[in-house]
C-alpha cells in the first residue's frame, strides 16, 4: 500500500509540528509548509525522510499552489489530508491595534485557509476518502474580548467549514475543523494581552455546566494533533479539544445573549 500523504501549513511549530511528528511516526509522507526556513530546518533534522519542506507565506496563493503541486507530484497526485493550520494571534483592544496587524491576522488566518482549500481541491478530488481540515478555535465559541479580529477569523473558518462540507461532498471530500482551547504554543505566548481588564475576563466566567472541569485547561499541541488523526478516521464536522468545549458550543449557540451577558458581568 502506498504511503498516505498530508500537507500541513504552519508545520514547523506548535500544532503543525506536533501533527507532522504524529503522522510521520504512523508512516505518512508529510509535506511541511511554514514561513520560517530556520524552523523548517529544525523539523527536517528531526524527520530525516518522508518530509519535504516548503518555505511559503500562505498569503501568497501562487507560492502555496506551487508547493502543494510539487508535493503531490511526488505522490502521483495523491493528497489524503490538507491541514490548513497556519495562523497568528495578536492581542489588544481593536482600536489600539495598527490596521496592518489586523490585516495580517485576516490574511494569514482566513485568506491562507481559502488559498489552501483552492490549491488542494484538485488533488483531494483525486484521492479516495480525502479530508480537508482547518484549525479554528474555541474563540469561535466564546468571542474573545481583546482578540476581536482573531475571533472573527476563527468564526469565519467555522462557517466556511460548514459550507464547504456540503459543497465538496459531491466529490467525496470530507471537510472538518479542529477547535482547540488555550494551547501551549508560540502563537499564544506571543498573543498574551497584559491589560488586566481583558486578561482576567475568561478566568471569571461562570461555567455553563458544573461538570465541565477541563474546559479552560491549557492544551498541548499533541492533543490537537491526535484530534486531527481522529478526524481522518472519523466523520464529524467539528473536533473540540478538549471535548467538553462541544457542550459549551451548543449552549452558546442556543443563547448568544446570555453568553454575552456572562462575559460583560465577568469584567465588572
Positions of the model-derived regions?
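Conserved glycine-rich cofactor-binding loop
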Residues: 12-13
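The beta1-alpha1 cofactor-binding region of Rossmann-like NAD(H)/NADP(H)-dependent oxidoreductases
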Residues: 56-66, 99
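Substrate-binding pocket helix/loop in short-chain dehydrogenase/reductase
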Residues: 93-94, 98-106
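Active-site helix of classical SDR
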Residues: 117, 153
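Alpha-helical segment proximal to the catalytic Tyr-Lys
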Residues: 122, 166-169
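Residue(s) in the substrate-gating loop at a strand-loop-helix junction
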Residues: 137
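SDR active-site lid
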Residues: 170-240
Amino acid at each position: 500500500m502506498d504511503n498516505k500523504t498530508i500537507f500541513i501549513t504552519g508545520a514547523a511549530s506548535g500544532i503543525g509540528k506536533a501533527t507532522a511528528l504524529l503522522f510521520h511516526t504512523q508512516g505518512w509522507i508529510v509535506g511541511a509548509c511554514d514561513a520560517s526556513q530556520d524552523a523548517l530546518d529544525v523539523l527536517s533534522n528531526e524527520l530525516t525522510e518522508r518530509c519535504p519542506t516548503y518555505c511559503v507565506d500562505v498569503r501568497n496563493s501562487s507560492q502555496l499552489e506551487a508547493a502543494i503541486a510539487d508535493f503531490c507530484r511526488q505522490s502521483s497526485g495523491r493528497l489524503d489530508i490538507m491541514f490548513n493550520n497556519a495562523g497568528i494571534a495578536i492581542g489588544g483592544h481593536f482600536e489600539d491595534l495598527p490596521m496592518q496587524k489586523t490585516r495580517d491576522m485576516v490574511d494569514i488566518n482566513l485568506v491562507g485557509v481559502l488559498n489552501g482549500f483552492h490549491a488542494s481541491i484538485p488533488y483531494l478530488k483525486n484521492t479516495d476518502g480525502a479530508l480537508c481540515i482547518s484549525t479554528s478555535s474555541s474563540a469561535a465559541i466564546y468571542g474573545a474580548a481583546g482578540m476581536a479580529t482573531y475571533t472573527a477569523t476563527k468564526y469565519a473558518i467555522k462557517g466556511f467549514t460548514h459550507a464547504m462540507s456540503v459543497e465538496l461532498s459531491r466529490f467525496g471530500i470530507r471537510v472538518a475543523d479542529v477547535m482547540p482551547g488555550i494551547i501551549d504554543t508560540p502563537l499564544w505566548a506571543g498573543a498574551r494581552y497584559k491589560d488586566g481588564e481583558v486578561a482576567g475576563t475568561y478566568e471569571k466566567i461562570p461555567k455553563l455546566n458544573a461538570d465541565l472541569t477541563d474546559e479552560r485547561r491549557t492544551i498541548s499541541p499533541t492533543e490537537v494533533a491526535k484530534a486531527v488523526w481522529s478526524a481522518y478516521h472519523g466523520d464529524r464536522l467539528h473536533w473540540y479539544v478538549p471535548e467538553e468545549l462541544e457542550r459549551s458550543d451548543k449552549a452558546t449557540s442556543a443563547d448568544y445573549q446570555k453568553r454575552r451577558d456572562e462575559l460583560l458581568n465577568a469584567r465588572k
